[in-house]
Amino acid sequence: QRVALARALAIHPQVLLLDEPLSALDAKIRVELRSEIRRIQRQLGITTIYVTHDQEEALSLSDRIVVMSAGQVEQIGTPFEIYNYPRTAFTAAFIGQLNMLPVTIADPQTGMCTFEGQPVATGEPIEAATGAAKHLAIRPEELGLGHSPGDNHLDGRIEAVTFLGAIVRVRVDLGDTFLSVDLFNERLLTLPQVNQAVTVNFPPHACWVTE
């Protein structure tokens, strides 16, 4: 891969097209080459179009990302914009992990919803009619376990705990819906137990309403 990249750069192209150049490599080498490609691109100042299905590659390498579905552009923006402010449900679900919570709009002006009768605040007005059925999108890293003043709270039971190294992913059963909660791993962390009753918390600004 390094030789192929060197050959492409030898002719001093105005635009460099890379079509999934790291897909056949193992994880560690892929991360190393990803950083190397980014360093070379910035050093030489060559406009680069990088095609990938790897979301982490797209977020870490890009100045701007184009998210496409079925040949149509879903959204164009910086990695920060694409991840934190997705404009479509497809973009939100495609980039990173995402929880989708079925809710009913209670008060569009104040951004209040309900989930199985429990109030959920979004912190901003909602463009939908009272009583409309929507979904609340929340990233797993925005969720926590336990009570937190001023946050939304949903009661559930732990269905699974998966250790992923830097994070611990907890799958919480809310009845007919599951939430993934990502906890930052630290040596003093007490791992939750399967079947343990828990309360999931998240701040109103961490979620947004979608179809």
Predicted regions and their residues:
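Hydrophobic alpha-helical segments and their boundary regions
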Residues: 34, 47, 85, 106, ...
